[in-house]
Amino acid sequence: MHSALLRQQLAAFLSPAELPDDDAPFLLDQRKRYTSTDCVVVQPASVENVQKTVRFCAQHRIAITPQGGNTGLVGGSVAHGGIVLNLGKLNRIRHISLADNAITVDAGCILQNVQTAAAEHGRFFPLSLASEGSCQIGGNIACNAGGLNVLRYGTMRDLVLGLEVALPNGELVSHLHPLHKNTTGYELKHLFIGSEGTLGIITGATLKLFAPQQTTETAWVGLDNVQAAISLLSNIKNHFAERLCSFELVSRFALQLSAAHSRLAEPLNAEWHILLELTDSLPRHDLQDELAEFLCQNGGEHSIIAQSDQQRRDLWTLRENISAAQRSLGTSIKHDIAVPIARTAEFIEQCGRDLTEQHPDIQLVVFGHLGDGSLHYNTFFPNELGDSVYRREEAVNATVYRHVLHNHGTIAAEHGIGTLKKSWLPQVRTADEIALMRAIKSQLDPNHLFNPNKLLPD
């Protein structure tokens, strides 16, 4: 159906405000690599209008691409024909139950707004991402977002108590009760968490809340090598247990980029750096002394412990600005990978050696969540941009992913598969697993209208 005619028919049941005149903000993906074409953008302002839109599309066999904050990095919400259904107008905080430590929200709620709502009620919602000021809860769930606090609180899958989902036939499956235990058969919410919008459109969610942190200690540690970081992680997890919230790895080059971009001094001079954070829900005046003593006794004597909120913010700025610093240099080839923590040093050493032998001008920007085994293993070429870089992508990816698989890892730790990585899925999932995924997809979406050409290989 032609876009103009499609828009005209949608206007029969959607208001003008739900059919934005300016499509541009919804068409270009975050990395400016993929652009939606020949499609109509809709922003339903109610769950009922999401259902009406889905039923209309089912009747006319029109593809639907769900979209949250459009912050994804793998082309997961880019459409070629049909409808882009953006959830941004579904942005209410529906209910907070302090007794249940739960918050129920619309899928279009900005993550930061959920964090704020929880804080206003004396609670803490732990999901934390660089894009938290613009990403939406529905997208976080659809991609099973991870972020900075996985080490203590788990991924988004661990934070979801219940979901409300519009199925491809327009029916609504809703189980938003804040139950922490439920053994009545298959836990259907897990079908939709991490499904990247291919099975249903998440319209609402009930999420876990936690006690706020009363004590926070943040340290920056300089180390000679990654194996030393792994040893420190093992010891600190054993000593501080659940109080260890974050354990971030940063290479020397990644720090140099971020420090220059952020106009901040490098905290320490070392080949590898760790940013770690301890939190406690009780006031603890001795936690800093305990951390300092521990670091001195466990190879972390070359370290700084933040002495003020401003110093803590500066340390986190250095970590969080790495991606922005790299973007300012031009086109990157990015890898969102994970390997078992014990094999991280081997992966970094062997993969880096092979890449520099194959591409002498390559620059490696290595950082990420060592505490849970996931890394942002990024590359760029100082004198190349755009298509020139992408022509090298196949060879670079082949090397990186070969080492990931050799070390029993995954090619998608946090960002999902989307368009970018779907051809690689058979390398990390068995034929039987992919066949089962296809069977689930066909059962729920027999006409394959929801987020077509994503996730599953052609």
Regions found by a protein language model. Give the residues of each.
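Activity-critical C-terminal alpha-helical subdomain
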Residues: 171, 422-458
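C-terminal substrate-recognition/cap domain of FAD-linked oxidoreductases
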Residues: 20-24, 207, 217-222, 228-392, ...
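Small/polar glycine-rich anion-binding or flexible loop at a beta-alpha turn
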Residues: 253, 370-373, 411-423
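N-terminal accessory segments
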Residues: 1-31, 59-62, 295-312, 406-411, ...
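FAD-binding subdomain of flavoenzyme oxidoreductases
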Residues: 92-248, 450
